[in-house]
């Protein structure tokens, strides 16, 4: 496995290709990805920010990609946002979800906790302030079409809005 990480070490030659890091959604996949990224940083001796040319993410992966592309957050620092403390803040159950009902018309979690954590990291910064190319993927349920936010095509969108749009799932988050 160590040979794999050699492609990320510094070379005297300029690479003829671009390296894109694509991160999946889903909490468990997001955490597993961070474990891999920490190993990559340790083996290569480089921050993930310096190892890739572009960051792409969906849902929880959009959060991770935004943190990495924004200002070079290290994977070890990113891991803290997936601790029990932060997850309890992000995944605060909606008042209506706990009420007895077979049909839930509201999302399971409130958005305030998620937005609060994102605000601690990104404040009111726009996608245009992200230091490396970043793409977040979302889906517009009403228009039944995909939505792509990036710092090069929609720099006026807030980072928080782009991440929230990507992680919005009607059953879980608004």
List where the protein language model places each region.
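Patatin-like phospholipase
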Residues: 14-22, 27-118, 148-150, 158-163
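Surface-exposed acidic, glycine-flexible loop patches that form ligand/cofactor-binding
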Residues: 8-13, 44-49, 119-132
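Small-residue-rich anion-binding loops in enzyme active sites
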Residues: 1-22, 141
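Generic intrinsically disordered, low-complexity segments enriched for polar/acidic and small residues
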Residues: 1-5, 49, 83, 136, ...
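Short amphipathic alpha-helical surface micro-motifs
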Residues: 1-4, 20, 116-120, 129-131, ...
């Amino acid at each position: 496995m160590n040979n794999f990480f050699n492609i990320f070490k510094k070379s005297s030659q300029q690479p003829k290709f671009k390296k894109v890091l694509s991160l999946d959604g889903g909490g468990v996949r997001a955490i597993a990805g961070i474990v891999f990224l920490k190993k990559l940083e340790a083996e290569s001796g480089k921050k993930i920010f310096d190892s890739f040319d572009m960051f792409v993410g969906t849902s929880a992966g959009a959060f991770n990609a935004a943190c990495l592309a924004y200002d070079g957050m290290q994977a070890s620092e990113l891991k803290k946002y997936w601790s029990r403390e932060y997850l309890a803040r992000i995944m605060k159950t909606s008042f209506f979800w706990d009420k007895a009902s077979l049909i839930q018309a509201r999302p399971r979690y409130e958005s305030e906790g998620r937005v609060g954590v994102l605000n601690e990291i990104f404040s009111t910064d726009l996608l245009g302030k992200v230091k490396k190319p970043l793409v977040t993927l979302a889906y517009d349920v009403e228009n039944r079409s995909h939505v792509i936010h990036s710092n090069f095509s929609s720099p006026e969108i807030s980072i928080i809005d782009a991440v929230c749009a990507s992680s919005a799932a009607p059953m879980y988050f608004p």
